[in-house]
Amino acid sequence: MNIILAKPRGFCAGVKRALLIVENALKIYKKTIYVQHELVHNQYVIETLRQKGVVFVEDISDIPNNSIVVFSAHGVSKKIKKKAIKKNLTILNATCPLVTKVHLEVSKSSKNGIETILIGHRGHPEVIGTIGQYDNKKGKIHLIEDIEDVNQLTIKIDKKLNFFTQTTLSIKNTQSIILALKKKFLNISGPKKEDICYATTNRQNAIIKLSKITDIILVIGSKNSSNSSRLSELGKETGVFTKQIESFSDIKEEWLKNKKNIGITAGASAPDILVEEVIKHLKKLGFKNPPKEMLGDEEKTIFKIPKNLNVQN
């Protein structure tokens, strides 16, 4: 019985940057570090930071004036930022640079009064933050989730129209939505390359490859992790038995019955230690062969943190 690891898997550059910002802030400041929303969507990571004294809040109003706040990797709306400034908070922005790029484009559309369409999942913090970059009352930003939303969409002025996407969507589904938009609105413009990030793309491509050489796939990632959920959905679409788990304790032995090759991947916010624990658990259950890593993309992207947060080792 074999264990095959997807490549790439686990932390992306945006998550690594966000974690480094908080870890360094804990070393530099002698005050409580507050984080608006979960820094990244992984319960293990959040609990680890909580044990170090980090306080997570959903409402910026719950943070005392003159405190230190970290904006999560998902980004925040302009309103949240204004509230933080009004409370005289020291802002440490851990927003993923790829999300910031989308924010800047949406803000530009807003400034120019161009109606804008955002493809994304309703209620996701990244989507809330991105929609919150559009504040021109003369224009409008529309959120769509699927092709049915495209069919029902009504635009006042479609001579100039822009679209953008959440960074953690299914590539396949998003491409079909974009095609539907371009078919309905001939003058629509979008980014040269869709906003889905490199890490999301690489992990989705990897799970497709993994599905061809395994008969079960375990996706490690929290339930509220968008990119992990997309990986799980994609694994199921390939026809391979796929389960999304938070940790090794979620694994049921019945899943492994008559399985010879078990594939493991992890969402962009899931740490390596969770993968290691799953491997250790599987070995106890009979998967004795050393795990093999499949061939895949080598990720070399690094996002720098603010200079004032650099810590000398």
UniProtKB/Swiss-Prot annotation:
The active site is at E126 (proton donor). Dimethylallyl diphosphate binds at H41, H74, H124, S225, S226, N227, S269. It catalyses: isopentenyl diphosphate + 2 oxidized [2Fe-2S]-[ferredoxin] + H2O = (2E)-4-hydroxy-3-methylbut-2-enyl diphosphate + 2 reduced [2Fe-2S]-[ferredoxin] + 2 H(+); dimethylallyl diphosphate + 2 oxidized [2Fe-2S]-[ferredoxin] + H2O = (2E)-4-hydroxy-3-methylbut-2-enyl diphosphate + 2 reduced [2Fe-2S]-[ferredoxin] + 2 H(+). Its EC number is 1.17.7.4. Pathway: Isoprenoid biosynthesis; dimethylallyl diphosphate biosynthesis; dimethylallyl diphosphate from (2E)-4-hydroxy-3-methylbutenyl diphosphate: step 1/1; Isoprenoid biosynthesis; isopentenyl diphosphate biosynthesis via DXP pathway; isopentenyl diphosphate from 1-deoxy-D-xylulose 5-phosphate: step 6/6. The keyword NAD does not apply. One of its GO terms (biological process) is dimethylallyl diphosphate biosynthetic process. Pfam families: LYTB. It is an enzyme of class 1 (oxidoreductase). (2E)-4-hydroxy-3-methylbut-2-enyl diphosphate binds at H41, H74, H124, T167, S225, S226, N227, S269. Catalyzes the conversion of 1-hydroxy-2-methyl-2-(E)-butenyl 4-diphosphate (HMBPP) into a mixture of isopentenyl diphosphate (IPP) and dimethylallyl diphosphate (DMAPP). Acts in the terminal step of the DOXP/MEP pathway for isoprenoid precursor biosynthesis. Belongs to the IspH family. HAMAP family: IspH (MF_00191). This is 4-hydroxy-3-methylbut-2-enyl diphosphate reductase. It comes from Buchnera aphidicola subsp. Schizaphis graminum (strain Sg). The lineage of its organism: Bacteria, Pseudomonadati, Pseudomonadota, Gammaproteobacteria, Enterobacterales.
